[in-house]
Amino acid sequence: MEGKVPAYKVNMVFFSVYGVLGCLFPFLTYYFQRQGISYAEMGVAFALVSLTSAVAQPIWGYLADKYSNKRKILIIALAGCVLSVYSLMLAGGFWLVSMSIILVMTFLSPLVPVTDAYCFALNRHYGGFEYGRFRLMGSLGFALVALLTGWAVRQWGMEVAWYLYSAMSLYAMVLILSIDFTDANPGITVRHTDMKRLFTNPKVMLLLGAVLLTHIAVGSNGSYIALLMEATGGDVAHIGLLWFIVAISELPFLFYGAHLVRFFGELNLFVIGLAAFVLRYLLNSVCTSYVAVVAIQLMQGFTAMFVLMAALEYLNRMAPGRLRTVAMTVHAAAVALGGMIGNLGGGVLLEYVTIFVLYQILAVVCAAALVLVYVLKKIDKTKRPRYAA
C-alpha cells in the first residue's frame, strides 16, 4: 500500500522505547542503595514507581483514544523523559528521590502501553504488522542497552545511566516524528457507557485480577533480584548481564508469539506461563550462586512473555475498537498496581525475612493468579481456532 509505514521504523521505535527502560529499571536498586535508602524506604520508592504508573497510564491512554492521536502522546511523553531524568541526578535523600521518581514515571509510564496500542492501530490500518515481531525488537533494545549501561555504570558511575536514558528518549522521539501515521478515527468517540460495560465484564475483571497478582510477584522480583544477585556473589556489572539474559531469552517466544497464541489459545498460554513462574521463583529461592540466578532467568521467555502475550491478545479481543488503548493502559495500570504492592510488600518483608524466603512467597502469589485464570477458563466459552502448522 502506498504510504505504508516502513516496518524497520516501527522496529526501531520498539528498540529505542525499551532501550529507555533498560537505562533505568535494572539499576534503580543500585541507585537507591547509593543514596543510603533503607529496605523499607526502598519499598516505598519502588511503590511510588508503580503507583505513579497506575495513576498516569489510564489518563494518558484516555487522552490517546479521546483525541485519536497516539503518536502525539508518545512525542509529548518522550520529551518529558528527555528532561525529567536529570532530577534523579540532582536529588539527594529519600524525599527528593521520591519526588523525582514521581516526575520521571509520569512521563515514562505511558511509553510501553501507548506504543503497543500504536502498533495494533498500524496493523488494523495497514495489515501485516505482527506485534510479537516488534516486541522482539523491544526486548533486544532492553537487553543491549541494559548490558551497555551496566558496564558504563561500573566504569563511570550512576550518572552515565541518566545521560543514556535522555539520549535514548530523544532518539525514540525523533523516530516517531518521522512516522507519518496519526491513527485518526473521525466520528469515533470514547463513551463512558462503553468503559462501564468493558470494566464490569467479569471475564475482563478476572483477567485483570490475575495480571495484578502476577505482577505483585514480577514487580517484587524486578526490584529485589539485585539483592539476590548480591547475596549470591554478584555485582553491578553482573546485574546488567542478568537483565541482558532476561531480555534475550524473550526473543524466540516473541518471534513465534502469534503462532503460540493461535495454537494454545490465550488462556491456555496464560496457564503455562503462570505455572512456569511458580517454578522459576521456587528455583530462585534455593540458589547459592549468582551464576545459577542468571541461568534461571532464561525462563523469562515462557513465563513473562506467555503471560504478556496472552493478556494483551485477550484484552484486544474483548475491548471495542474505540477503547483498545484504554484497555491496554488499564492492563498496564494493573501491572503497575501489582508492582506497587510487590515493591512495598517486598521492602517491608525484607526487614524480617531473607531474600530467599521472599522468593518462596512470590511463588505462592503466582499460584494464586493461576487459580484465577483457571476460573476464567471455566467461564470463557469462546472457542479459539487451533493453529495449523
Residue ranges: model-predicted function:
Residues 1-4, 179-211:
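Juxtamembrane intracellular "pre-TM" segments in multi-pass secondary transporters
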Residues 2-50, 204-242:
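Helix-loop boundary and gating motifs at the non-cytosolic
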Residues 39-40, 125-137, 236-237, 319-331:
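Loop-to-transmembrane helix entry/capping segments in MFS-fold secondary transporters
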Residues 55-69, 153, 252-265, 350-351:
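Helix-to-loop junctions at the C-terminal end of transmembrane segments
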Residues 66-78, 262-274:
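Cytoplasmic membrane-interface "Motif A"-like loop-to-helix N-cap segments
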Residues 79-92, 275-288:
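C-terminal ends and interior cores of transmembrane alpha-helices
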Residues 104-137:
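Cytoplasmic helix-loop-helix junction between adjacent transmembrane helices
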Residues 151-168, 348-366:
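A membrane-interface helix-boundary motif in multi-pass transporters
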